[in-house]
Amino acid sequence: MALVDETSIDEAGFRMSEATAGDFFALLKPRVMSLVVFTAFVGLVAAPVTINPLLAVIAILSIAIGAGASGALNMWYDADIDAVMTRTASRPVPSGRIQPHEALSFGLVLSVLSVMTLGVLVNWLSATLLAFTIFFYAVVYTMWLKRWTPQNIVIGGAAGAIPPVIGWAAVTGSVSLESIVLFLIIFLWTPPHFWALALFKSGDYERAGIPMMPNVAGHASTRRQIFAYALVLAPVGVAPWLLGYTTPFYGVAAMLLGLGFVWYAWKVLGMADDDRAMKPAKALFAYSLLYLFAIFAAYLADSVVERALAMGGA
């Protein structure tokens, strides 16, 4: 059912689309938003002090809305390239279900709402970090890096890695080494995750003119870089335990998950240049999603149990 009737709204000829609530929800990139919210929640819970439960809910909702705003602004600007990629052609803007000006307005309103709510009701450091994240993703990455350099997702990955730092700052009003380590885990995870996708979607990116690594440096070079990042990510994933932030439970879980990541990356490294099935790349892409969720779930469980034991012994 349409939210509004199609109608002329001004002399410039802008039209209100017959979009559904589901179309606007899709603008938020809910799958991406769910990972952002989860990692931010882990940062919030792992912080060494407690936060009022109501403020915690406000912080997480603000981060979620901010992440969704970034997605909406990304879809507004990328409508031209989304339209020629099979993976993204059905998105609300390129498919015509939502007008570009609606996506832009929606994204801008949510951006301001999320940042102001977080700043006024929680603290301004976390709000500033959220504002920076929205700007970095929607402007620096989407409008510049994505179409300019094969290092787009390496540099742009910083936006997706900041949420646990925002969660931490929402509780403590500061940034610590522990929150930066959580940032590094996501930052180093991002290139192999997206390059695995780019390997088996290189045709899409080629048609859209996006300089992803496989299209610029070739598949062989991309496979080597994926493996190199996996070798760095694995020990960084264990770093929170080595630095004394977690118990051995997390350390063992992170070690096993990291070894799994390296093994899948090794399989990608050994792919033949003429491999059209791309099964190792698809397997790594799927495993990388599991890895990020599992390693942060282990961190969350470790933090909750450790805090419960500390309270019990008090």
From Swiss-Prot:
It is a multi-pass membrane protein. GO terms for biological process: heme O biosynthetic process. Pfam families: UbiA. InterPro entries: Protohaem_IX_farnesylTrfase (IPR006369), UbiA_prenyltransferase (IPR000537), UbiA_prenylTrfase_CS (IPR030470), UbiA_sf (IPR044878). GO terms for molecular function: protoheme IX farnesyltransferase activity. GO terms for cellular component: plasma membrane. It is found in: Cell inner membrane. It comes from the Bacteria. Pathway: Porphyrin-containing compound metabolism; heme O biosynthesis; heme O from protoheme: step 1/1. Its EC number is 2.5.1.141. The keyword Ion transport does not apply. It catalyses: heme b + (2E,6E)-farnesyl diphosphate + H2O = Fe(II)-heme o + diphosphate. Keywords: Cell inner membrane, Cell membrane, Heme biosynthesis, Membrane, Transferase, Transmembrane, Transmembrane helix. It is an enzyme of class 2 (transferase). The chain crosses the membrane at residues 32-49, 54-76, 98-118, 120-140, 153-173, 180-200, 226-246, 249-269, 285-305. Belongs to the UbiA prenyltransferase family. Protoheme IX farnesyltransferase subfamily. PANTHER family: 4-HYDROXYBENZOATE SOLANESYLTRANSFERASE (PTHR43448:SF7), PROTOHEME IX FARNESYLTRANSFERASE, MITOCHONDRIAL (PTHR43448). Carbon 2 of the heme B porphyrin ring is defined according to the Fischer nomenclature. Converts heme B (protoheme IX) to heme O by substitution of the vinyl group on carbon 2 of heme B porphyrin ring with a hydroxyethyl farnesyl side group. This is Protoheme IX farnesyltransferase 2. It comes from Mesorhizobium japonicum (strain LMG 29417 / CECT 9101 / MAFF 303099).
